[in-house]
Amino acid sequence: MAHTVKKLLIANRGEIALRVVRTAKEMGISTVAVYSEQDRNSRYVDMADEAYLLSGDTYKDTYLNEDLLIDILRKTGSDAVHPGYGFLSEVPSFAQKVEDAGACLLYTSPSPRDSTSS
């Protein structure tokens, strides 16, 4: 089933987040960026339609904090998440939480689903 994305949460940082913001804007999709204190002045943060600070000192507290990202997903009304690469892009529990929140996870193969299940 096709899903039309209207608002995209970008759950990553740096160059990948910038590329996703640019592409989404070209497609007419509203963007939501997340950032840590160290990324506050990054270009992707300025280019996004909305941006939310991830409080914390470690990646575990920020970009790997599944529940915090799902809260932002819900708060912003985003209907899709682009995880970029690394961080949560291959974490089955995050994919399930995104789905449970009524949004879709955009990713490329291989799937972040558990490859051990048949």
Q: Positions of the model-derived regions?
A:
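ATP-binding N-terminal substructure of ATP-dependent carboxylate-amine bond-forming enzymes
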Residues: M1-L106
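Conserved small/polar residues in nucleotide/adenosyl-binding loops
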Residues: Y107-R113
